[in-house]
Regions:
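Class I S-adenosyl-L-methionine-dependent methyltransferase catalytic core
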Residues: 1-147
Length: 147
């Protein structure tokens, strides 16, 4: 887990909470578990939530020592319907290295070309309300938010 950073307004999501947030998005239909798609992580930080989305919704595995996508899962990672946004250039670089698609740097100025079926987020505490309102704006009708 990454260390909190007050200057960045960054407080990492514990792995167990990230798992619970993403797992709660699942839908069981006719005995099959599916996840809504596409999914947005608008304040991706160190990738804790994004890694859980990759693992649960897209069966993409990351090496827990390096964070990088398992060599056998690189193609699945590229095709995963998961978009990440991150303000910190350092975190963006790590997310890209770890196999995530980073589509923008500032969620509040993001103008998506599609609406999202699910949004999982741990927004900066100082801008939590603005991030939640923006999430409602970029979510599909009937979509799901986990915050």
């Amino acid at each position: 887990m990454t260390t909190p950073n007050d200057a960045l307004d960054f407080y990492p999501t514990p792995d167990s909470l990230a798992f619970d947030m993403v797992f709660s998005l699942r839908e069981v239909k006719s005995g099959f578990t599916t996840y809504p798609k596409p999914i947005l992580e608008p304040s991706a930080g160190d990738g804790a939530l994004a890694r859980q989305v990759h693992a649960l919704a897209f069966n993409v595995h990351h090496d827990y020592k390096t964070g990088e996508v398992d060599r056998y899962d690189k193609e699945k990672a590229r095709s995963a319907e998961l978009d990440c946004i991150e303000l910190s250039s350092d975190f963006r670089a790590v997310l890209k290295k770890d196999g995530f698609r980073v589509v923008h740097d500032n969620f509040l100025t993001f103008r998506p070309t599609t609406k999202y079926a699910a949004i999982v987020m741990n927004p900066p505490f100082s801008a939590g309300a603005a991030h939640l309102l923006k999430a409602l704006d970029v979510m599909q009708d009937g979509g799901k938010i986990r915050c």
